[in-house]
Amino acid sequence: MPTINVNKIDLEKLINMSLSDKTIDHKFPMMGVEVEEIFEENNQKIVQFSINPDRPDYLSVEGLARGFRGFIGIDAGLPKYDIYASDLEVYVENVKSRPYCGFAIIKNIIIDDLVLESIINLQEKLHWSIGRDRKKMAIGIHDLDKIEAPFYYKEINGDEIEFEPLGHNELMTPKEVLEKHEKGVKYAHLLRGDKFPIIVDKNNAVISMPPIINGNLTKVGTETRNLLVEITGTDKNAVENTLNIIVCALADRRGTIFSLKLINNGNETISPDLTPDSAEITIDEINTRLGLNLNAGEIIACLKKARYDAQYSYEDENIKITIPAYRTDILNNMDIIKDVAINYGYENFNGNLPVVATIGEKHDIEKKFEFIRNTMIGYGLFEVMNLTLSNQDVLFNKMNENIEDNEYVEVLKPASIEHRVVRPTILPLLLETLANNKHNELPQKIFEVGDCVVIDEKDETLYTHCKNVPKVSAVITHHNANFNEIKGLVEGLIREMNIEYSIDNYKHPSFIEGRCAKIIVDDEIVGYFGELHPEVILNFELGYPVVGFEMEIK
């Protein structure tokens, strides 16, 4: 879990009360935020918090203070953030590498050393958590008074413009930034092709080269009073969610929020948008999940402590909830129920010890997983662990498969478009891992063992009509990767598992015809292997031959 270091005086100032170390140690964990340690640094008391990944709004001292004020009853209900319209415009062109953007203006903010440190730390934590190290989104915060509107977000050639990158006094082109600047070298893999995203002002002064570096011109300091916030990325939800979190944090510092008009091919949108979300939940649903007997008033009180607005509808006999825009973690009613539990107080729940003592042991499938892991590692492969959620593009389109020819389980309310399908296969995710590591040396040999989810109309478990299928998959890439190499790996693994099998020719759209085989056990096809089709290799932007296999674990 990510950790943040918070200056205790700054935290107390935002909460508007003094806090003893004992209070911090006791109260914050009950709010769902672990206190790692309290220590002194440069004669200042520092509190280190461990933040759950599902609460990115807690990655700043402003967010923690906002949540704590509600938790202890200083504030209640939805925080109010006024947005004033500015006359500033941003012209957005078609930026293929990072097509989504969001902008906001914060005026009249007082920035001292603590505020500046908080802004920088929040940026970096959000880059890692929501941004996946700037892949999904990147943040830029600038001194507004040093630039002139309108602003332009567009693509340019690598040598089309020169600017001073942040922290440097040397003029560089975008191409030179990727070759010479430490941030450019580190994040060059995020920009492919000969066009580079850039944000400039009316006078063509460079504000930012996302997701790499800001311009030196707009560097923020303690003298800054007005800010331009820009978020760009590959994931629309990530961009919008990040902008909301940052804008609310800066508003909690008494900054005033102003919107801008984004103009894209004649279409106009206003940014930021802090419109609250809404949800409905019944009293029975909450009480059944928590094992409590709360009435509507008690539930609403808990919800308001969690900084929701809530009211009971006698007509519908449910509770209507308004969710603040910075709560990007709310996916369904279970998240709301968890907040009710936290603000009811975990210490108020009664626990009963089980009547019968039990001793756990590894499930048979876990024993097989462990055996396969050890065998694959013995063959010189590295284990990776991908997310169970992916998307149709990675799982099917890039694998030369028609989506219509495949059945899969789709998430009802995905957190992002990149994670809306439960994987029915592992192989595409391994290819995506290779794509993310193509800047590393060859050969690369990786495998994964884990569950996939497939449609099964006969399965009545929880009425889902789907089931888990354990699988093992591996890929190998280097200059001379070939069919015989992957065939030897597959046969070696199956022999180690002491399974009778046979191999026959197989036609699969992801593999080269004539260089693909199926694995047959008990007259049933349990897997396949071979040389990946050149189109698949190009779809994942890989530069060398790739071989791979995937097999069910019976």
Swiss-Prot record:
Main location (coarse class): cytoplasm
Cofactor(s) required, per the database record: Mg(2+)
E.C. number: 6.1.1.20
Molecular function in Gene Ontology: ATP binding; magnesium ion binding; phenylalanine-tRNA ligase activity; RNA binding
GO cellular component: phenylalanine-tRNA ligase complex
Classification via InterPro entries: aa-tRNA-synth_II/BPL/LPL, B3/B4_tRNA-bd, DNA-bd_dom_put_sf, Phe-tRNA-ligase_IIc_bsu, Phe-tRNA-synth_IIc_bsu_arc_euk, Phe-tRNA_synthase-like_B3/B4, Phe_tRNA_ligase_beta2_arc, PheRS_beta_core
Binding of Mg(2+), residues: D329, D335, D339
Subcellular location per the Swiss-Prot or TrEMBL entry: Cytoplasm
Catalysis performed (reactions): tRNA(Phe) + L-phenylalanine + ATP = L-phenylalanyl-tRNA(Phe) + AMP + diphosphate + H(+)
Entry's family note: Belongs to the phenylalanyl-tRNA synthetase beta subunit family. Type 2 subfamily.
Subunit comment: Tetramer of two alpha and two beta subunits.
Protein name in the entry: Phenylalanine--tRNA ligase beta subunit
Taxon lineage: Archaea, Methanobacteriati, Methanobacteriota, Methanomada group, Methanococci
Gene behind this protein: pheT
